[in-house]
């Protein structure tokens, strides 16, 4: 479709020239007025101008302050991007909506990654001794399930195969080794009884049953371990007596320990993610509080300016009223003085007339006497 094609620089230049000459309106007349075959409809021209070519639009990614502002406004207004864009200068509603979709998808992906269990560690990561011990225990339990359940026979394991933290040459370890070498008829305790001992410290065991040498030799032959009967019923120097069921329990404990470690690692990652979210929320709240304080300060300043303007207007109004009152008083006084002056002038004129009448009558009287 033509509307989906990428805009070319010459088309943008045509739109800019059209807006400079005719203003951002009547987009359906662009081709007619500019005498250019612009294969774009009016809506496409409007969207191009409003979202990309309009002066004042910022290009590039959002800054951290703009991101915090958009997150706060989205929590306040929802997905009303036109209202949000009105409060974020230089950004359009379309740009903010796309940024929010990418931000939300990134958050969901981080949450899924934090809840996903960690991958299975390689033998190098788990450790050489742990890997050997676990594989040997699984092989032993898998090939001899019935023999381990009916009558567990003692096996001899070389001491170097065990990890260093299982090695011990103390007296209690020797007693534990003797107890493992001659278990009672009932199954052993669920707790792991595994230790190392030497032949010099461990006491000699009693005579084994008639069937024990042949069965022990047959059991130990497939794995390459010598049987106790080959050494007179006692463990050779540097060897440890290990019970098959105890070894399986040890492997199970190791697996449980590894599962606990993985769960702890997952919990730690989730806690770190939650802590990061809390820090972001606190930062947003601090920025919001700072903005609210600034807005409150600006509101107070505007109120003080309005009060100052109102007070100045009141003073000016009182001044105008007093000046008008003084002018009225002066005019009244002037009118009164004019009236008084007119009255005095009338009296003087009357007096002059009276004086003129008296002089005429006096002159006529004198003429008659003569």
UniProtKB/Swiss-Prot annotation:
- Where is it mainly found? nucleus
One Pfam family per UniProt: Myb_DNA-bind_6
> What are the subcellular locations of this protein?
Nucleus
- Which parts of this chain are annotated as the region Disordered? 107-129
Look up keyword S-adenosyl-L-methionine and say if it applies. no
Q: Which residues bind DNA?
A: 27-53, 81-104
Identify the GO cellular component terms for this protein: condensed chromosome; nucleolus
Q: Which SUPFAM superfamilies match?
A: Homeodomain-like
The record ties this protein, via InterPro entries, to: Homeodomain-like_sf, Leaf_Dev_Regulator, Myb_dom, SANT/Myb
Under the heading Gene3D superfamilies, the entry gives: Homeodomain-like
* GO MF terms, alphabetically ordered: protein homodimerization activity; transcription cis-regulatory region binding
Taking the record's annotation, the residue ranges forming a coiled coil are 276-340
Tell me the ranges covered by the HTH myb-type domain, including all copies: 1-53, 54-108
UniProt function note: Transcription factor required for normal cell differentiation. Interacts directly with asymmetric leaves 2 (AS2) to repress the knox homeobox genes.
- Assembly and interactions? Homodimer. Interacts with AS2, WRKY1, HIRA, a probable histone chaperone, and RIK, a predicted RNA binding protein.
Q: What is known of its domains?
A: A C-terminal domain (245-347) is required for dimerization.
Q: What is this protein called?
A: Protein rough sheath 2
Q: Which gene encodes it?
A: RS2
């Amino acid at each position: 479709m033509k509307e989906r094609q990428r805009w070319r620089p010459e088309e943008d230049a045509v739109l800019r020239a059209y807006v400079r000459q005719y203003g951002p309106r009547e987009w359906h007349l662009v081709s007619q007025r500019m005498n250019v075959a612009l294969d774009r409809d009016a809506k496409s021209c409007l969207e191009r101008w409003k979202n990309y070519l309009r002066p004042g639009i910022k290009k590039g990614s959002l800054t951290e302050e703009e991101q915090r502002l958009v997150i706060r406004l989205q929590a306040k207004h929802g997905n009303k991007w036109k209202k949000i864009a009105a409060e974020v200068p230089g950004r359009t509603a379309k740009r903010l909506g796309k940024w929010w979709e990418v931000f939300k998808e990134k958050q969901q992906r981080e949450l899924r990654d934090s809840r996903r269990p960690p991958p299975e560690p390689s033998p190098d990561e788990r450790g050489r001794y742990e890997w050997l011990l676990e594989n040997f225990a699984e092989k032993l339990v898998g090939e001899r399930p019935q023999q381990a359940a009916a009558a567990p026979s003692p096996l001899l394991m070389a001491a170097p195969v065990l990890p260093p933290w299982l090695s011990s040459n103390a007296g209690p370890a020797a007693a534990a080794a003797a107890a493992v070498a001659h278990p009672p008829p009932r199954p052993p305790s669920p707790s792991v009884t595994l230790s190392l001992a030497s032949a010099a410290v461990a006491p000699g065991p009693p005579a084994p049953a008639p069937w024990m040498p042949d069965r022990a030799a047959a059991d130990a032959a497939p794995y390459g371990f010598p049987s106790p009967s080959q050494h007179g019923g006692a463990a050779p120097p540097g060897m440890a007596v290990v019970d098959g069921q105890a070894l399986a329990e040890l492997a199970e404990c190791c697996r449980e320990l590894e599962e606990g470690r993985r769960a702890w690692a997952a919990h730690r990652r989730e806690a770190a993610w939650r802590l990061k979210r809390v820090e972001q929320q606190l930062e947003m709240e601090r920025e919001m509080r700072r903005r609210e304080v600034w807005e409150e300060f600006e509101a107070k300043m505007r109120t003080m300016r309005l009060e100052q303007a109102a007070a100045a207007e009141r003073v000016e109004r009182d001044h105008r009223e007093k000046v008008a009152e003084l002018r009225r008083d002066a005019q009244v006084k002037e009118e009164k003085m004019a009236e008084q002056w007119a009255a005095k002038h009338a009296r003087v004129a009357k007096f002059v007339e009276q004086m003129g009448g008296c002089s005429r009558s006096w002159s006529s009287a004198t003429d008659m006497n003569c």
